[in-house]
């Protein structure tokens, strides 16, 4: 099952977490947040390099940001960037992460 984590502003995540999670959830990584100007920032990759994941996340790993993070464990669908979270629902307005399979959408 995928892992979704919400990092509150008051929490700093340890680098070791990224190393541990990638052992089981290695089929995609992504995160989303609002920057200080209230712009939506997203990042996603299918790289299996946990240090790359942490390095992309590190600038937001402080008390200024609440961050939604998703580590994918593939159950269906290809291991491609398009199947990696967060998903854009409405550009620059709505992004989502979910657990499980959603099918039949157009």
What are these model-derived regions, one by one?
Residues 100:
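Active-site glycine/GP-rich loop and adjacent strand/helix microenvironment
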Residues 24-25, 59-63, 88-91:
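Flexible, charged surface loops at secondary-structure boundaries
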Residues 1-53, 67:
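Extreme N-terminus nucleophile/cap motif
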Residues 103-106:
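Short histidine
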Residues 97:
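Short, acidic, Ser/Thr-enriched surface-loop or helix-capping motifs
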Residues 75-94:
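Acidic loop->beta-strand submotif enriched in PP2C/PPM serine/threonine phosphatases
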Residues 60, 64-65, 69-75:
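Regulatory input/activation interfaces that engage signals or partners
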Residues 56-62, 78-79, 83:
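GIY-YIG nuclease catalytic motif and its immediate N-terminal context
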